[in-house]
């Protein structure tokens, strides 16, 4: 059995607070129509591309017409990335999943 040290708990809490700070900053940027410049500042081109790919993965998993292997070929993403997306989608709150279906599959 592994035990987590107070040090690792403190680091995890600090990282969570930093994440929440970023989320609030992004919310404020949207309110002031500065979200695109903020995201371009905060994310590298590769990170922005990876986020776009993840959206496509979630979209296709929700659509349910392709296997994970087909998604790998279609999107050029690693099977581990697709599997993580699938597992995350399975554990997502029902409300979020329904919202994603409405937003991502509305043109389907």
Swiss-Prot record:
Q: Which domain of life is it from?
A: Bacteria
Q: Which UniProt keywords apply?
A: Cytoplasm, DNA-binding, Repressor, Transcription, Transcription regulation
One Pfam family name is Trp_repressor
Its subcellular locations are: Cytoplasm
UniProt GO cellular component terms: cytoplasm
Gene3D superfamilies xrefs: TrpR-like (1.10.1270.10)
- Quote one Gene Ontology molecular function term: DNA-binding transcription factor activity
InterPro entries in the cross-refs: Trp_repress, Trp_repress_bac, Trp_repressor/repl_initiator, TrpR-like_sf
> Where DNA binds (residue ranges)?
68-91
Tell me one GO biological process term. negative regulation of DNA-templated transcription
Transmembrane region(s): none
User: What family is it from?
Assistant: Belongs to the TrpR family.
PANTHER family referenced in this protein's UniProt entry, alphabetically: TRP OPERON REPRESSOR (PTHR38025:SF1)
What the protein does? Answer: This protein is an aporepressor. When complexed with L-tryptophan it binds the operator region of the trp operon (5'-ACTAGT-'3') and prevents the initiation of transcription. The complex also regulates trp repressor biosynthesis by binding to its regulatory region.
Q: Oligomeric state and partners?
A: Homodimer.
**Any idea what this protein is called?**
Trp operon repressor
Originating organism: Salmonella paratyphi A (strain AKU_12601)
Gene name tied to this protein? trpR
